[in-house]
Structures are given as structure tokens and as C-alpha cells.
From Swiss-Prot:
The keyword Oxidoreductase does not apply. Disulfide bonds: none annotated. One of its GO terms (cellular component) is plasma membrane. This is Iron-uptake system permease protein FeuC. It comes from the Bacteria. The keyword rRNA-binding does not apply. It is a multi-pass membrane protein. Involved in the uptake of iron. Probably responsible for the translocation of the substrate across the membrane. Part of the ABC transporter complex FeuABC/YusV involved in import of the catecholate siderophores bacillibactin and enterobactin.
């Protein structure tokens, strides 16, 4: 596994390098190193790298890490390889909470104060938790959380919260509405060190909790009777895991909008490479998620100059065919 981790870390570093040096204003390798390590740095390059490009790369890495790990956990909880935070409605719930924040505090999305940056993840957490609670209420069947119902309920909740977000967005003034639309499409254009400072504690708190539950996740993938026979309170553990996932997803959505399909694609690739043990799946899912989001942000920035396509749209272009492929593959397996 160490070689696989090293491979993806190397790929992340390569894409990050090109993201830092490429664009409308290119940076040579020597200038990049001298600026990053403060060896006779050029003030122009300092502004370009430390204020504009480096925050985007760091933010993309944090978001990819969080969504990749959260997606793997959600797939384990639901025992469904097609589960994804976006499909389940958690992204939409968190998004509705953050749109409400933007409506209540007009223009606060651009405020760089730490108070405003901290407020958005909290509103997102409230929205995400409401979505998760509704999933629990409607997916609860015969004293247990029905893994099959979770997906159907999640799709309905996703539609409901998306409609609510649109309704709230229409109440904004034109400038804030335009900002909200760009954000909802999954954009990292507004990344800055304040938002990184705001989202990082959520990752440092909840990701270790999920990784610490790796052995439990290996057990939860069995049927409910087997889990109960091992003396594990399945519903209690699922609740803890789901709350941790919602917190991570809400923090990611608050600073970058909806990054669809990261939580679907990364765990699938990870399971193919790492097998069935979650102590390997979760870290690898995080690394793959980092690579996906950094690459999508870089592609949207580079290939459509002078315009810029949000990373969320690039990920959706990749994710929809992959989702249909998995759906076809699952259906084919059931008919075999």
C-alpha cells in the first residue's frame, strides 16, 4: 500500500506544481522555489502565489481529502456503492443552509473576517444535519436504518433542498445572486487563507474520528443480524459516523459549493486498489479525492482561458458518465 500512497502523493504534487506555475501569468521553476522558500523573492510572485494560486491548491486539497473520506464512509454505512453525499441530499442541505447565511448577511461571502468564514460552516452544518435527520426519519424501517431506502429518500431530499436554495437565491440582490450561483456550481475562485483557517479545524477534528472507526466500518458492511451478533450497536455507530460525515461535507460545501461525485468516484477507485479494509480505503480515498479536485480546478482554469469553468462542473462532466457506468454494471450484476 505504501507504493500506492506514494504514487498518488506524487501525482498530487505534479498537478499542484502545474497549477501553481501555469495560467495567464506563468511562473518559472526557479521563481516558484525562490518565492515559496523566501530566497530573494519577487514581490509580484509573492502576491500571485501566496494570495491567489497557493490558497486554491491548498483549499482544493482539503476539500478533496474531506469529500473522498466522507464518501467512502457513507458508502460503507449505506452498503451501497452508488451512495454519494450529493446524491443523498447532504450537499444540498448544507448548501441551503449556506445560501440562507448569504441571504441573512448580504455580501458576507466576500468578507474575509474569520467570524464570517466560521459562520458559513455552522449554517452548512445545520442544513446538512436537517437533511441527515430527514433521511433517518424516512429511511427508518422496522427499527433499523434501511440502506436501500436511504438512496431513494436522499434523492427526494436533494431535490427539495435544491429547490429551497433556488428560492432563497432569488430573494438576493443581483450581485449576491450571481455570487451564489458561481459558488453553487463548485468554485474555488474565492479561496483565501481565512477560509482555509475556518475549514481546517473541522477536518482535523472529524477525519481522525472516521479513520479511527475503520475496523467498525469493516464490520458494518455485513448484514444487520451479523453486526448485532457481534455486540455492536449498529444504529448508534451509524449515527456517529453520519454526523461526522455531515460536519466534513458542510465545511467543504461552505467554502467551495457543491463538488459532486468526488465522494462517489474516489472510494470506488480506492476499493479497487486497496481491497476491502477501510484502514487502507479511507486514506487512499482522501488522496484520490485531493487529486480529483486539484486536477478539476486546474483544468477549469487552464483549458477555458480567459474564462474559468468551476471545478464542480468539470467534476460533473467526469462524474455523470462514471455514475451511469456503475449503475449499468450493478444492474448487469443483478441480472447475471
Amino acid at each position: 500500500m505504501a507504493k500506492k500512497y506514494a504514487l498518488f502523493i506524487a501525482l498530487i504534487l505534479v498537478v499542484s506544481y502545474f497549477s501553481l506555475t501555469s495560467g495567464s501569468f506563468s511562473v518559472r521553476p526557479a521563481e516558484l522555489l525562490s518565492t515559496l522558500f523566501q530566497i530573494d523573492p519577487n514581490p509580484q510572485y509573492e502576491i500571485l502565489l501566496f494570495d491567489l494560486r497557493l490558497p486554491r491548491v491548498v483549499m482544493a486539497a482539503i476539500i478533496g481529502l474531506g469529500l473522498g473520506i466522507a464518501g467512502a464512509v457513507i458508502q460503507a454505512i449505506t452498503r451501497n456503492g452508488l451512495a454519494d453525499p450529493g446524491i443523498l441530499g447532504i450537499n444540498a442541505g448544507a448548501g441551503a443552509g449556506i445560501v440562507a447565511f448569504m441571504l441573512l448577511f448580504q455580501g458576507q461571502k466576500e468578507v474575509t473576517s474569520i467570524a464570517a468564514a466560521m459562520g458559513m460552516p455552522l449554517f452548512g452544518l445545520i442544513g446538512g444535519l436537517i437533511a441527515a435527520i430527514l433521511i433517518y426519519i424516512f429511511a427508518w424501517h422496522r427499527g433499523n436504518l434501511d440502506s436501500g431506502r436511504i438512496i431513494l429518500v436522499g434523492i427526494a431530499i436533494n431535490s427539495g433542498f435544491s429547490a429551497l436554495s433556488l428560492f432563497l437565491s432569488l430573494k438576493m440582490d443581483p450581485q449576491d445572486y450571481q455570487m451564489a450561483m458561481v459558488w453553487k456550481n463548485g468554485s474555488i475562485w474565492s479561496a483565501n487563507w481565512t477560509y482555509i483557517t475556518a475549514v481546517l479545524p473541522w477536518m482535523l477534528l472529524f477525519i481522525p474520528i472516521l479513520i479511527g472507526k475503520s475496523r467498525l466500518l469493516d464490520t458494518i458492511r455485513f448484514d444487520e443480524d451479523t453486526v448485532r451478533s457481534l455486540g455492536i450497536s449498529s444504529n448508534k455507530e451509524k449515527t456517529i459516523l453520519l454526523v461526522a460525515c455531515v460536519a466534513i461535507i458542510s465545511a467543504c460545501v461552505s467554502v467551495a459549493g457543491s463538488m459532486a461525485f468526488v465522494g462517489l468516484i474516489a472510494p470506488h477507485i480506492s476499493r479497487r486498489l486497496a481491497g476491502v479494509e477501510h484502514r487502507y480505503i479511507l486514506p487512499l480515498s482522501g488522496l484520490i479525492g485531493m487529486l480529483l479536485v486539484i486536477s478539476a480546478d486546474f483544468a477549469g482554469k487552464l483549458f477555458f482561458q480567459p474564462a474559468e469553468v468551476p471545478a464542480g462542473i468539470i467534476l460533473a462532466i467526469l462524474g455523470v458518465p462514471y455514475f451511469l457506468y456503475l449503475l449499468f454494471k450493478q444492474k448487469k450484476g443483478e441480472n447475471a
